[in-house]
Amino acid sequence: MAISTTKPSLLPPVPQRLFSRHDLIPPRQDVLWRIERGAVRTVTWSEQGTLITLGYWGMGDLVGQPLSRVVPYQIECLTSVETSIVPPELWHQTIDSMLSHIQQSEELLSIIHRKPVSLRLWQFLVWLAEKFGRDVDQGRLIDLGVTHQEMAEVINTTRVSVTRMLQQFEEQGMLLRHQRRLILCLPIQRFRM
């Protein structure tokens, strides 16, 4: 982990920190973390130890304990991540990012209540494609490695069910696999929420 000071686009100079894949970003009460590069997920777990995914966050998003009342609360790096520390005196300058945080949380909440589970998985893939994807010749590449287990945790099903549904989507021509990534093959407009 390295610390440096740089100047993000709209904020005065703030300390930056680098984290490696699988690192945990400290959930401090006194700062928010702006994701400058990379992707993280926020999680908690139930009394029985079941992992509960709260959100997936990427470039420009804010995360941090001050945005959540959930305890326990953990920020896990899914890739190498560069963050800026945003202290409370600068929070008023982050309203757009905070609104985006709320909107994304509500989008995920609506996805996890979809039925049947296959629709829930498909809508989650669409959401990932919109947030972390890029256009390629075959469709929209989800440029984030999300495991079948991680997908299962988000949509509240089993890893085996996710694997089976992904195979069905592939057989139906809805997605392709490319170097451990997924490509959604239908035009994005056809399967938006």
Positions of the model-derived regions?
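Regulatory nucleotide-sensing modules
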Residues: 1-37
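Short acidic-glycine-tyrosine-enriched beta hairpin
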Residues: 15-24, 46-63
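Glycine- and acidic-residue-biased ligand/ion/polar-headgroup-sensing regions
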Residues: 29-45, 58-60
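A structural signal for short hydrophobic beta-strand segments in well-ordered beta-sheet cores
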Residues: 33, 75, 174-175
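Surface loops and adjacent helix of pleckstrin homology
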Residues: 37, 45-47, 68, 87-88, ...
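Cyclic-nucleotide recognition modules
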Residues: 52-107
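Polybasic "coupling" helices that flank or enter modular domains
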Residues: 96-157
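Phosphate-/nucleic-acid-contacting segments
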Residues: 132-193
